[in-house]
Swiss-Prot record:
GO biological process: translation
Gene Ontology molecular function: any one: structural constituent of ribosome
Family annotation (PROSITE patterns): RIBOSOMAL_L27
UniProt KW RNA-binding keyword: no
Protein name, entry field: Large ribosomal subunit protein bL27
Pfam families for this protein: Ribosomal_L27 (PF01016)
Cellular-component GO terms for this entry: cytosolic large ribosomal subunit
Gene: rpmA
Length: 85
């Protein structure tokens, strides 16, 4: 009898779609108001002057200018600011 018993199914075989997080615009670049600077989970980067934060912690420019990344404070927090050009 050349028969083969059916194999069981696996519980693996799934993978989530990439979320495309990260820094979208870098220091020294000119940016327009409303453009996204960083997409992140939590506050890896904090909003400085001229930068707003969305409900998913996305940082975006509130004014037109040049992006500036800086580390400030006793905790070494990373801030993103937009300096008017």
């Amino acid at each position: 009898m050349a028969h083969k018993k059916a194999g069981g199914s696996t519980r693996n075989g799934r993978d989530s779609e990439a979320k495309r997080l990260g820094v979208k615009m870098y220091g020294g670049q000119v940016i327009k108001a409303g453009n996204i600077i960083v997409r992140q989970r939590g506050t890896q980067f904090h909003a400085g002057y001229g930068v707003g934060m969305g409900k998913d912690h996305t940082l975006f420019a509130k004014i037109e200018g040049v992006i500036k990344f800086e580390v400030k404070g006793a905790f070494g927090r990373r801030y993103v600011s937009v300096v008017a050009a």
